[in-house]
Amino acid sequence: MTDKTSLSYKDAGVDIDAGNALVGRIKGVVKKTRRPEVMGGLGGFGALCALPQKYREPVLVSGTDGVGTKLRLAMDLKRHDTIGIDLVAMCVNDLVVQGAEPLFFLDYYATGKLDVDTASAVISGIAEGCLQSGCSLVGGETAEMPGMYHGEDYDVAGFCVGVVEKSEIIDGSKVSDGDVLIALGSSGPHSNGYSLVRKILEVSGCDPQTTELDGKPLADHLLAPTRIYVKSVLELIEKVDVHAIAHLTGGGFWENIPRVLPDNTQAVIDESSWQWPEVFNWLQTAGNVERHEMYRTFNCGVGMIIALPAPEVDKALALLNANGENTWKIGIIKASDSEQRVVIE
């Protein structure tokens, strides 16, 4: 025998009991997201999911993302209940622009010291995002890593798999001269540009919890969860000939719209067709941000842009509005050999 103290994993900063308590806390909300194709429950070494039988030539579509430094703002303000929705939204919105129906989602939650209440709030938000998008939360990893993160700081990442009929993949190849562009309004900055947001808050000396904008704290505008467009867009795709969809994330208008444009086409955006939500006006003014930089960093009130034939526009707007989306005609596609793929005028 030795007089040395017997060390445990908990002494090293990893509390397995806290991890088990978290699993017990989240089981109920995770179960609500279950799709009929999912086989087995939580706790297996891998999650099993069958393909929906309605697909003749199913193609799997995958995506992974995080929420950037919006997470830092959420931690600073101690508001953890909606950041999980952001995480799901960033993944599933990227899938649906290709016509894919999200099937299942997995998350990765890493922290220096596991706080069960905080982690439970985040994962409950992830489950809510999965409910909004119709996909199952089938598993995840909670990693308590002392020395890797400061205190109870945490990071999250998500991974999603969806499915689309091979013949119905939306890849922008059908976009042509004369197509109309319609916009789907955003709920705010979504999950992009937050390093600039935080810099503006720092330089301006503004407290987002006490500064009011449109009758509510600025923090509410900045932490509004990213809108999930999946169910509205999937119904639209079923009933309307959609040529392309762009999800306006990092890179804003200048970089995301060209991703779905064929060669020799140009998107012409009518800046007078909408008014920026006040949060973007505040950011531009408080940070003295140039117009071009605003459109490169933020969505400026536009979460998605959809290209479709002119005769389909009225039907598309009616369908989207009926599903609660804020939509409008934002521009057109023109034939052009210009290197400038997007024009805002």
Swiss-Prot record:
CDD domains referenced in this protein's UniProt entry, alphabetically:
PurM
Q: Answer yes or no on keyword Repressor.
A: no
Q: What class of enzyme is it?
A: ligase
Naming one, the record's GO cellular component terms include:
cytosol
* Keywords attached to this entry: ATP-binding, Cytoplasm, Ligase, Nucleotide-binding, Purine biosynthesis
- InterPro entries from the entry? PurM-like_C_dom, PurM-like_C_sf, PurM-like_N, PurM-like_N_sf, PurM_cligase
Which cysteine-cysteine pairs are annotated as disulfide bonds in the entry?
A: none
- Which transformation does this protein catalyse, written as a reaction? 2-formamido-N(1)-(5-O-phospho-beta-D-ribosyl)acetamidine + ATP = 5-amino-1-(5-phospho-beta-D-ribosyl)imidazole + ADP + phosphate + H(+)
GO terms for molecular function, please? Answer: ATP binding; phosphoribosylamine-glycine ligase activity; phosphoribosylformylglycinamidine cyclo-ligase activity
Q: Where in the cell is it found?
A: Cytoplasm
Q: What is this enzyme's EC?
A: 6.3.3.1
BP terms from Gene Ontology = 'de novo' IMP biosynthetic process; adenine biosynthetic process
The yes or no answer to whether the keyword Acyltransferase is present is no
Named in its record, the pathway it takes part in is: Purine metabolism; IMP biosynthesis via de novo pathway; 5-amino-1-(5-phospho-D-ribosyl)imidazole from N(2)-formyl-N(1)-(5-phospho-D-ribosyl)glycinamide: step 2/2
Family recorded in the similarity comment: Belongs to the AIR synthase family.
- The protein here is known as Phosphoribosylformylglycinamidine cyclo-ligase
Q: Report the source organism.
A: Shigella dysenteriae serotype 1 (strain Sd197)
Q: What is the name of the gene encoding this protein?
A: purM
